[in-house]
């Protein structure tokens, strides 16, 4: 059913909610997993235009993606990584389309009101601008 699952990661504790769900689903369905993080700091947003060197944040993000990929591979799953640069919702949608993903998986913070305006916009934009199914798992508040 879901041949390739895109997992949008934040490099934050919220990822702990989505990773086990996707791993279990991928095992049961024989799905491939694409782990995606979108770096959206100043360097990331201007990286190509200004031919900038990779920032420490971007290096940390690459290492984080690989660490999570190793966890998936240790369970016998096929996992690849992608560090995208720019606006998170746009890059998630672009990667899901270009990589022919059949499911987008994300963690939700469960914000309300102002928090939705600030933090919930990525999920809102992704789920309202794709025909690909979106799996949301609520992250525990810590």
Predicted regions and their residues:
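Structural beta-alpha unit
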Residues: 70-104, 141-142
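Small/aliphatic-rich secondary-structure junction motif
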Residues: 3-49, 71
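General small-molecule cofactor/ligand-binding pocket signal
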Residues: 36, 80-84, 135
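Short, hinge-like loop/turn segments at secondary-structure boundaries
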Residues: 50-54, 98-100, 122-123
């Amino acid at each position: 059913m879901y041949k390739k699952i895109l997992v949008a990661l934040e490099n934050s504790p919220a990822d702990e909610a989505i990773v086990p769900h996707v791993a279990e689903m991928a095992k049961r369905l024989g799905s491939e997993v694409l782990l995606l993080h979108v770096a959206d700091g100043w360097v990331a947003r201007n990286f190509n235009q200004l031919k900038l060197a990779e920032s420490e944040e971007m290096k940390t993000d690459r290492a984080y993606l690989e660490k999570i990929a190793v966890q998936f591979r240790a369970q016998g799953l096929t996992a690849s990584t992608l560090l995208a640069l720019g606006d998170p919702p746009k890059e998630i949608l672009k990667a899901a389309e270009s990589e022919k993903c059949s499911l987008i998986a994300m963690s939700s913070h469960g914000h309300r009101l102002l928090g939705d305006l600030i933090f919930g916009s990525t999920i809102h934009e992704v789920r309202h601008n794709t025909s690909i199914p979106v799996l949301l798992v609520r992250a525990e508040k810590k």
